[in-house]
Amino acid sequence: MPNVLEEVPRPGRVAIVRLRSLGDCVLSTPALALLKRARADLRVAVVAEARFHALFEHNPDVDDILRPDPRVLRRWRPDLCLNLHGGTRSAFLTLVSGARWRAGFGHFRYQFAYNVHIPRAQEILGAERTVHTAEHLASAIFYLGAPVQEIPRARLGATGQPPPARPYAVLHAVATAPEKTWRADGFLEVARHIEESGLEAVFIGAAGDDLRPFSRHRIVQGAPLGQVKTLLAGASLFVGNDSGPAHMAAAFGLPSVVIFGPSDPAIWAPWRARSEVVKVPGGMAEVTVAQVVNALVRLRVSA
């Protein structure tokens, strides 16, 4: 493997392009930690949409957060630009970044945008198996020259808050697609079980989500990501569909029960967090309340 990181000047500047997807942004943070471990002198910028900037704030592995504007990126003057997204816009940003080294995975489109072509994660890790998204993203850092090692948990920085007056669990009962969304009455039954254990059930969702079925419980809706980070950082438990907030919860080491539809848990399960995955062959419609409650019991979380 080439050792690009050894060739980058000291001190050097590395821009990481990570557009779109809450979960992917969270799961890119182990790669950022590995990069800083390998070269503590590097100044690292993350290029991301404004709505995701809060995910990278207060992270000691991130020095700058840039909006995805070619002029902004060129003015930042990266020595190395690594694309962890792979779409058209991210390829263009990488191409015009002005970086001497422009790196992207070999399966990305627009290979002309890159002069460092990263092979499959399985080849880098020496493991012919399905790899988790965190492993896939981290493998790019290994290929660039960081020592291959255990990949850490995702990392989100949050401002310190006093302990809550009452311990609580966060429930995320919505998702981006119907086939990834468990039924509302199931979540209500699970919330009842959680409250019987002594935890308050707090439901979260985006501004456009329909949270009316959960109105008897505390609801945090449309909150900025920074506030959601703080809420998760202070929680005792997370229960939710396979979605971005589940990865945020795992980044805080929150014991989690995650209900899966069509996605593969080998790729998308909570990374390095105490968790239980509930997935059945028939999809979300076949998941029972008993299965989710039994997963909660196995986690042994209570007030």
Q: Where do the model's predicted regions map?
A:
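Catalytic machinery of carbohydrate-active enzymes
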Residues: 1-303
